[in-house]
UniProtKB/Swiss-Prot annotation:
It catalyses: RNA(n) + a ribonucleoside 5'-triphosphate = RNA(n+1) + diphosphate. Pfam families: RNA_pol_Rpb6. The keyword Zinc does not apply. This is DNA-directed RNA polymerase subunit omega. The gene is rpoZ. Promotes RNA polymerase assembly. Latches the N- and C-terminal regions of the beta' subunit thereby facilitating its interaction with the beta and alpha subunits. Belongs to the RNA polymerase subunit omega family. NCBIfam families: rpoZ.
Length: 117
């Protein structure tokens, strides 16, 4: 059985077999943890999906691990802030709807009281 993509094509993208294995494993873990894929896959398994991405050149070894960590921290902070903003918007929408409902009930009671007089 031939490996697809071929080892030669994969080694064109990285410096060594060791680097290839490490990159594949890390990317497979990212895909497992629901990281966004960079392309549509033919394969079902995350390890083979990672190899497809490496062969296409859409996934690379980051030249500076420290810079990658900083980038990931910034990305997670941005995601956290976006989630917080979304939550705040939902809370504001709920408060607005509750205020509108309260105003309707108040108007309804006032209309009933006026009709009863």
């Amino acid at each position: 059985m031939m490996l697809e993509p071929s080892i030669d094509k994969l080694l064109d993208q990285v410096d060594s077999k060791y680097s290839l294995v490490v990159l594949e494993a890390k990317r497979a873990h990212e895909l497992r943890d629901k990281e966004r894929p960079t392309k549509e896959f033919k394969a079902v398994k995350n390890t083979l999906r990672a190899l497809e991405e490496i062969a296409d050149g859409t996934v690379k070894i980051h030249p500076s691990p420290e810079l990658k960590r900083e980038t990931l921290v910034e990305k997670r902070e941005l995601e956290r802030l976006q989630a917080k903003m979304k939550e705040q918007l939902i809370k504001e929408q709920i408060a607005k709807e509750e205020a509108e409902e309260e105003a309707k009930q108040k108007n309804s009671r006032a209309a009933k009281a006026a009709a009863a007089e």
